[in-house]
């Protein structure tokens, strides 16, 4: 052949393609497939009430400043017009106005955003307007979901922003824009991760990750000829998208996940999907004997791999994630908080999207406790920053929204803590302490059904 590759006897199919999953995640997938959880949904026993049906959807813009962060939440603009693009333009104007009036920053200081759409049909239109907010490299990390009628009558878009009030030169970003075998390139104007200084460590905001195959940028699925069930395809996607989160976290030197949200879409077998997501999350935070033995094995350096003909030895050894770093955990609890949240739609028609907050730190203390209406987990980072997750059990649905408001007031009224509330029930119009993410259902650890889940970020109480 005339080509250089032909003269060398190399064909495209001879070039090594990395496996889709690393060793640790491949092992986790095999374990899931070997013992699938029982499929037992309980939607029939749930109340039919949701935010749209309640007639009490009245989202108020919320602003909080704490821990060097300024959060601006629940911005809508139905008055700008019926079209999603028009409303995103209205939201952009409101965001710029708030930032300019404060004198505390500009849109260049936004490090994370949550975009809630009425429908994913509007994804491309909203993306075009949203991109106009950010002119510099490393735009904010982002999570985008569709909530349907839960946004309220006439509302096509709602956006919330996290603004870093610290020096710009101390931020770090990861913005992957080209295809590779490592992790998906972004499918919109966002960074995969943004990292900011928090005390003596760093907070790392990771964009929502869906199960795209990095090389093709198509949703992962098993070969149809293999006769795989929806369950096997879903398990592949839930593991792959979590691997994306892990790889980005590792690249950003995350030591520990403060918490994670597994956004789910679809209508059938949702309890099973939530339990599967929990099981893989738990699995990846279980330290086994093999990992402890790995710590004592010598690591091959680059010379050995390239010139010492020991690359195969390195390739055969199971890849173990650098996350989690158990050395920083100063408590018996070892699995970070987890919520699974059912929404109407996710980007690209995905049925799973992982979104997490990581930290680079020297010390983490995790304290679980039972409270009046459910369960609470406090995670204190470097004795400075507190991340709290509160679960309100489905059996306490009758206390929402009044009881939920009391919980928020208790934690936020005098501390300027920032709250994110995931719920299928209406909140009072006076809710002004944080961000609302309306959803169809929510689960916590072990796939327990919840009436609401609350995430709080604040300075550790003195």
Predicted regions and their residues:
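Short, polar/acidic, helix-capping and beta-turn segments at strand->helix junctions
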Residues: 1-462
């Amino acid at each position: 052949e005339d080509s250089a590759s032909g003269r060398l006897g190399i064909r495209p199919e001879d070039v090594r393609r990395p496996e889709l999953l690393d060793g640790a995640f491949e092992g986790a997938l095999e374990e899931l497939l070997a013992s699938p959880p029982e499929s037992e949904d309980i939607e029939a026993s749930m109340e039919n009430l949701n935010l749209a049906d309640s007639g009490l959807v009245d989202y108020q813009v919320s602003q909080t400043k704490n821990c060097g962060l300024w959060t601006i939440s629940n911005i809508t603009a139905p008055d700008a017009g019926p079209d999603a693009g028009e409303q995103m333009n209205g939201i952009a104007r409101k965001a710029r106005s708030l930032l300019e009036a404060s004198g505390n920053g500009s849109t260049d200081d936004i490090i994370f955003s949550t975009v809630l759409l009425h429908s994913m049909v509007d994804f491309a239109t909203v993306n075009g307007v949203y991109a106009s907010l950010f002119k510099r490299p490393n735009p904010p990390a982002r999570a985008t979901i569709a909530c349907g009628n839960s946004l309220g009558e006439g509302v096509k878009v709602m956006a919330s922003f996290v603004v870093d009030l610290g020096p710009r030169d101390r931020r770090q970003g990861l913005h992957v824009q080209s295809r590779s075998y490592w992790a998906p390139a972004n499918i919109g104007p966002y960074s995969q991760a943004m990292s900011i200084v928090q005390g003596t460590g760093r907070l790392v905001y990771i964009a929502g990750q869906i199960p795209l195959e990095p090389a093709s940028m198509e949703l992962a699925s098993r070969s149809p000829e293999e006769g795989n069930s929806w369950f096997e395809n879903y398990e592949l996607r839930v593991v792959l998208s979590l691997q994306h989160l892990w790889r980005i976290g590792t690249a950003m030197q995350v030591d520990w996940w403060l918490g994670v949200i597994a956004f789910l879409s679809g209508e059938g077998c949702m309890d099973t999907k939530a339990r599967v997501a929990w099981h893989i999350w738990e699995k990846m935070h279980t330290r086994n004997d093999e990992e402890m033995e790995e710590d004592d094995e010598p690591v091959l350096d680059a010379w050995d791999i390239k010139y010492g003909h020991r690359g195969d030895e390195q390739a055969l050894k199971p890849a173990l994630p650098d996350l989690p770093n158990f050395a920083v955990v100063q408590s018996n609890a070892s699995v970070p908080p987890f919520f699974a949240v059912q929404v109407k739609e996710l980007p690209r028609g995905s049925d799973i999207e992982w979104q997490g907050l990581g930290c680079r730190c020297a010390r983490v203390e995790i304290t679980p406790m039972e409270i009046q209406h459910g369960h609470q987990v406090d995670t204190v980072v470097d004795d400075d920053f507190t991340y709290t997750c509160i679960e309100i059990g489905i059996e306490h649905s009758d206390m929402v929204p009044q009881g939920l408001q009391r919980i928020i007031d208790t934690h936020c009224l005098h501390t300027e803590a920032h709250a994110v509330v995931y719920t299928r029930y209406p909140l009072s119009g006076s809710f002004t302490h944080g961000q609302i993410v309306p959803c169809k259902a929510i689960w916590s650890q072990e796939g327990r059904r919840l009436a609401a889940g609350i995430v709080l970020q604040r300075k550790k109480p003195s």
